[in-house]
Each structure stands twice: as C-alpha cells, then as structure tokens.
UniProtKB/Swiss-Prot annotation:
Catalytic activity: guanosine(527) in 16S rRNA + S-adenosyl-L-methionine = N(7)-methylguanosine(527) in 16S rRNA + S-adenosyl-L-homocysteine
Predominant subcellular localization, coarse grouping: cytoplasm
Coiled-coil region: none
Gene Ontology MF terms: rRNA (guanine-N7-)-methyltransferase activity
Family: Belongs to the methyltransferase superfamily. RNA methyltransferase RsmG family.
Protein name: Ribosomal RNA small subunit methyltransferase G
Positions bound to S-adenosyl-L-methionine: G71, F76, I120, E121, R134
EC number per UniProt: 2.1.1.170
Organism of origin: Gluconacetobacter diazotrophicus (strain ATCC 49037 / DSM 5601 / CCUG 37298 / CIP 103539 / LMG 7603 / PAl5)
Length: 210
C-alpha cells in the first residue's frame, strides 16, 4: 500500500524530506500489523498526530549536534529528527522488535542513526548535546535517565501534554533547570519543553521535609 503524507500541517516540508516521510510511513504501517508501534486508529492520522508533532523539534536543534532519543519506539521523535536535520542521532529502544523496525526504517530512508537496543539506564554512549523523548515517562524520570549521557552544556527537548506543570513541579524537587515552554502547533494541549542548565539539587538545598 502506498502511503502519502497528508499535506495539512506540512507546508514548507521539502519534497525530498516528504518522500522519506512517505517511505517511513509505508514501513510503519506494514510493521504495525505485527507489533504495536502506534494505535491502529492513528494510522489514518500519522501526519497530524505523530510526524508533524515531531517535526516541530527540528528547528530547535543546532546543526551537527549529537542527539540521543530515549524510548524511540515507532521512530518518534528520533527518527523523524534524523530525517529532517543533520544531527548525529542515537535511538535508544529496549524492545528488540521495535529496534528491528527502526533498523529497517532507517536503512530505507537513509537516516544517519545509531540504534541501541538496550534499556535506557544501560545505554553506554558518549555525551550528547541534546536529549529528546515523547510519550515515554514523567519528567522526573526523564531527567534521571538523561543525566547519564547529557553533556554539561546540553539541553533536553520533551514533548509534553496537559500535565506539564504538575511534572515540572515534581521535577523541581530534585533538579535545577532553566525552563522554556513552547506551545505545540499540532496539539492544543501540548507543550514542548526545552530544559537547559540541568543539575541535581544538593541535599543541603532541599526544602525541609524532603
């Protein structure tokens, strides 16, 4: 079945990138009948709910950086970023079947990626300037995982939903960070978090009772 990326939300996507996204969507649709990469009801809305959502991050990523995407699953957002930028992307995915999908999709679209088929906490990779994740875990856990390989001058980009402020409050108990909030262009309840200057709260800085 030939799958064409839908044009809505896709204005400004170069033809070469659109062709790669079409090929990626074809492969994802085929694999989704065997393993759960996205909800079956989302297949007809891959552009709006998944691809365009992840493409928002491309303009926020500096040229040529090393980037780690945690819990890459169906390729969101890491493989989309690899197609849309020149970042050196590492995809971390512990599910072996999903990692196999990522390998096939990356080869088919010519994406520059390294795939680590291990748990995030067991991934042994050099420091990266950017860490990304989408629909993976609450912010405190994302920051804990990121701390293993985020460079001191690096930052995180996380796609978050309506509970973002609660997650930021919870994370502030253990982490100092400079927070930038960018409204999602594809999800009315969504927020892109850019977190920099991240460091763990020292015991002496904790509020009484924590």
């Amino acid at each position: 079945m030939m799958f064409h990326v839908k044009p809505q939300g896709g204005n400004g996507v170069p033809d070469a990138l659109r062709a790669k996204l079409d090929r990626f969507a074809e492969i994802l649709t085929r694999w989704n009948s065997r393993i759960n990469l996205v909800s079956p009801r989302d297949l007809a809305h891959l552009w709006d709910r998944h691809i365009a959502d992840c493409l928002q991050l491309a303009s926020l990523i500096p040229p040529g950086v090393r980037l780690a995407d945690m819990g890459s699953g169906g390729g969101f957002p890491g493989l989309i970023i690899a197609m849309a930028t020149d970042a050196d992307v590492t995809l971390i995915e512990s599910d072996q079947r999903k990692a196999a999908f990522l390998r096939e999709a990356a080869r088919a679209v010519g994406a520059r990626v390294t795939i680590i088929a291990r748990r995030i906490e067991d991934a042994d990779i050099p420091p990266v300037q950017v860490v990304t994740a989408r629909a993976l875990a609450a912010l405190p856990q994302l920051l804990e995982w990121s701390s293993h390989f985020l460079a001191p001058d690096g930052f995180c980009l996380f796609l978050k939903g309506r509970n973002v402020e609660d997650e930021l409050t919870a994370a502030a108990a253990d982490w100092h960070m400079a927070v930038s909030r960018l409204p999602s262009r594809t999800n009315a309840d969504g927020t892109i978090l850019r977190l920099g200057d991240i460091r763990r709260v020292r015991h002496s800085e904790r509020a009484p009772g924590r």
